[in-house]
From Swiss-Prot:
NCBIfam families: PRK13529.1. It comes from the Bacteria. GO terms for cellular component: cytosol. This is NAD-dependent malic enzyme. Keywords: Metal-binding, NAD, Oxidoreductase. SUPFAM superfamilies: Aminoacid dehydrogenase-like, N-terminal domain, NAD(P)-binding Rossmann-fold domains. Coiled coil: none annotated. Its EC number is 1.1.1.38. The keyword GTP-binding does not apply. GO terms for molecular function: malate dehydrogenase (decarboxylating) (NAD+) activity; metal ion binding; NAD binding; oxaloacetate decarboxylase activity. The record marks 270 as: Important for activity.
Length: 565
């Protein structure tokens, strides 16, 4: 459902003069009217011409096109964001296909690596371990009293790039930009946070420009006590906030999620968001082929928290489609750097133990090795779906893809690792190795593949199709928790918008131009499920839709009226 046009009420603000021009949430730049310039002491501080936001956006677009590298474009857009947020979001929404890869993956990876080098202006909250005793004071320093979404990282596992220390702040900033651009959540309601617990990246520790705490990472009890202090301070300051954990290391991601998901409204996008968008993609791909996900055999390369999170959600979906839990688990095979996860493998992590295959059931496999490699698994399982979340480039080799295609006429191959440099195989290679028969979805953006004069569109399995809608649904419904069923409803809704399902051709996921429409639909489904599950107050469907409309922020300037502090 499209948002209804709503009349914007005037905004009463106490700021004036240069202070107002330095306030990104309120600054209009050359779009301040003459009346506003008189009322807010801006006469002479701006050029004479009063411009519209579209005229400003056109100038910014021309300037943007003058930059030759993606990182320079990223820096330019961040500068606009730190100067005039409304213009930033108008510009991004006007050119979302072009700019999403620049403000987020893959370019944000380089921005994180070079964070201290390209730093210009502070955004968000930096909480170092050294300042742990000032946690409440730090959060009180945030001027926004009505924060509704926080994205927090400790910078230890940034995309596939590893430990970036406080450089990881680029991820919460980019993620929240998408909450606004795709999900209509007002930037005034968002807060990026980095927990600076040190870094084990020696290159950063040796870098004279590094702006973080120069200390090895704290671990174990010290680490968990520090995170707990942060959570308790957030609950005290903003008790109804949605907290998203982002890019925490595997050893901490699942324990933190399990510890806090029933204490504060929270989720981990790397685990749950990735799982939701992947399952939505697989539901759509299965339906487009005239079947169900429960009929497919699935092999994973990568058995970390993200891979296992996806696997568990696939199992839940196939149970919804009629499989028993045992039958559902027998169709999912997890491979990591030590081979196929089996019940005979030592030192498994707790979240991996339910995803093992029984070694006794593999006695008839065609292999001479005790370690069952990805090729061994593909050769013996004959999977319909191959998913890569390894963070390592090139592991989907030609031999593996051709072996899969030998037994599956229409394989679904999803190299999901980010950024582009870490992808398990390129779409170009996968299409060629399967004679044009593979359905490919990637974690990073790729251009369409041209093979034998035919164009193959490549869907980006982008979490941005999921988390903005979840955030909007939580805010609109007032949900106190995010349940597994709410995530499943998001996946199902995403699948319903697949052009491949709706039209029999095209992408398996919607186009970016439709992402706000999809986010609104997901918000409604998530809010409705929250009400059904008792984590939100029940209302009518009309009331929920109205709440979504009311909370959907759009990049338009409002009239200002002067008031005193």
């Amino acid at each position: 459902m499209e948002p209804k046009t709503k009349k914007q009420r005037s905004l009463y603000i106490p700021y004036a003069g240069p202070v107002l021009l330095e306030f990104p949430l309120l600054n209009k730049g050359s779009a301040f009217s003459m009346e506003e310039r008189r009322n807010f002491n801006l006469l002479g501080l701006l050029p004479e011409v009063v411009e519209t936001i579209e005229e400003q956006a056109e100038r910014a677009w021309i300037q943007y096109q003058g930059f030759k590298t993606e990182i320079d474009k990223h820096i330019y857009l961040r500068n606009i964001q730190d100067t005039n947020e409304t213009l930033f979001y108008r510009l991004v929404n006007n050119h979302l296909d072009e700019m999403m890869p620049v403000i987020y993956t893959p370019t944000v990876g380089a921005a994180c690596e070079r964070f201290s080098e390209i730093y210009r202006r502070s955004r968000g909250v930096f909480i170092s371990y050294q300042n742990r005793h000032n946690m409440d004071d730090i959060l009180q320093n945030v001027p926004n009293h009505n924060i509704k979404v926080i994205v927090v990282t400790d910078g230890e596992r940034i995309l596939g790039l590893g430990d970036q220390g406080i450089g990881g702040m680029g991820i919460p900033i980019g993620k929240l930009s998408l909450y606004t651009a795709c999900g209509g959540i007002s930037p005034a309601y968002t807060l990026p946070v980095v927990l600076d617990v040190g870094t084990n990246n020696q290159q950063l520790l040796n870098d004279p420009l590094y702006m973080g705490w120069r200390n090895p990472r704290i671990i174990d009890d010290e680490y968990y006590e520090f995170v707990d202090e942060f959570i308790q301070a957030v609950k005290q300051r903003w008790p109804d906030v949605l907290l998203q954990f982002e890019d925490f290391a595997q050893k901490n991601a699942m324990p933190l999620l399990n510890r806090y998901r029933n204490e504060i409204c929270s989720f981990n996008d790397d685990i749950q968001g990735t799982a939701a968008v992947t399952v939505g993609t697989l539901i759509a791909a299965s339906r487009a082929a005239g079947g169900q996900l429960s009929e497919k055999k699935i092999v994973f390369l990568g058995a970390g928290s993200a891979g296992c999170g996806i696997a568990e959600m696939i199992i839940a979906q196939t149970q919804r489609e009629g499989l028993s839990e045992e039958a559902a688990r027998q169709k999912v095979f997890m491979v990591d750097r030590f081979g196929l996860l089996t019940d005979k493998m030592p030192n498994l992590l707790p979240f991996q133990t339910k995803l093992v295959q029984k070694r006794e059931n593999l006695s008839d496999w065609d292999t001479d090795s005790d370690v069952l490699s990805l090729l061994d698994v593909v050769r013996n399982v004959k999977p319909d779906i191959l998913i890569g979340v390894s963070g390592q480039t090139g592991l989907f080799t030609e031999e593996i893809i051709r072996e899969m295609h030998k037994h599956c006429p229409r394989p679904i191959v999803m190299p999901l690792s980010n950024p582009t440099s870490r992808v398990e195989a390129t779409p170009q290679d996968i299409i060629a190795w399967t004679e044009g028969n593979a359905l490919v979805a990637t974690g990073s953006p790729f251009n369409p593949v041209v093979w034998k004069d035919k164009i193959y569109p490549i869907a980006q399995c982008n979490n941005a199709f999921i988390f903005p809608g979840i955030g909007l649904g939580v805010i609109a419904s007032g949900a106190s928790r995010i349940t597994d069923e709410m995530l499943m409803s998001a996946s199902e809704t995403l699948a319903q918008y697949s052009p491949l399902v709706l039209n029999g051709e095209g992408l398996v996921l919607p186009e970016l131009k439709d992402i706000q429409k999809v986010s609104r639909a997901i918000a409604f489904a998530v809010g409705k499920m929250a009400q059904q599950q008792g984590v939100a107050v029940k209302t009518s469907a009309e009331a929920l839709q109205q709440a979504i409309d009311d909370n959907f922020w759009q990049a338009e300037y409002r009239d200002y009226r002067r008031t005193s502090i």
